[in-house]
Amino acid sequence: MCTSIALMGDNFCFGRTLDLGCGFGDGAVITPRNYVLKFRCGEVMRRHQGYIGMAAVVDGFALYADGMNESGVCIAALDFKGNAHYPPLPQGGRRGIAPFEVIPYILGKCESLADVRKALDEVSIVDVPFSDEVPNSPLHWHIADASGSVVVESTECGMQIYENEHGVLANNPPFPFHRDNCTLYLNATNEPCGQEGVFCNGVMGHGIPGDYTSPSRFVRAAWLRKYASCEGEAGLFSLLGAVAPPRGVVTGEDGGEHFTRYTCAMSPDELCYAYKDAESGEILRTYMKKESLDGETLI
């Protein structure tokens, strides 16, 4: 369970909740420009965009859940169990990249969403695990910059890139379902009901689902993003809080509690990655501008 939101406007911000039954990540990790990226297909990036995000560092490699590069391209990987499919070999003469390589590939290579579309046209996402101990996760990806956002899904029908006018993403089902499902809520607006009464205040948005299923979180996030007068990091944290399950309300298939482990907000204008820990509620910020981005080792 996860939800991501691209909050457009003069102060573009991108963020997500990470909702799991277990923790993830060692905190914000920066990959500097001269950290050598070696992809399983054989491609090597010796110099690239610097980027930051939440990652678990395994054998000296940062396995990112989300991130932002110094050009303002942002990405989040969300669970896509049930529909994610990675072929064993690249399709259509494209180069192959592993699922765990999608984030470093995009953030290292692309300076804009236009670059993202072009880069993805050249690759297939293939079933190559990081290691025997770290298998691939079923994922799809929400990618955005100040100009808009796209969703990338690899299913048995192949890899698809969808324009995402709603600017949000949740989990399974595939994005076309979520997009079409939103049309069922076109009558829900922020306009007053036109009648006086004890129940009139707050009736705007009546019918928007409030549970924590993926379709409901997608609709709720899309509706809030459309109507809320929120901007910047604070506004994004406010929106994400409306779709973040607290501890105890969601039980996973394993019988454990699934809740929001962290919520993050990426601010390209400031090159700031901020994340809020679910346990303490404290917001921790890392500014890329304050670090040496020309290094060769992870920060």
Predicted regions: what is each one?
Residues M1-C13, A119, V128-S131, N136-S137, ...:
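C-terminus-biased signal that marks the final domain/tail of proteins
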Residues G92, G96-I97, V123-L169:
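Acidic/His-rich structured neighborhood in mature extracellular/periplasmic domains
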Residues F14-D19, E153-T155, Y275-D277:
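Catalytic Cys-His active-site segments of thiol-dependent hydrolases/isopeptidases
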Residues G92-P129, G232-S238:
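Proteins synthesized as precursors that undergo proteolytic processing into mature forms
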Residues L20-C22, K81-N83, C157-Q160, E279-I283:
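Short, surface-exposed beta-strand-loop junctions and turns on beta-sheet-rich folds
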Residues L18, D79, D145-S147, E156, ...:
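Short, flexible loop/turn elements at secondary-structure junctions
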Residues M1-R94, D127:
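A contiguous strand-loop segment
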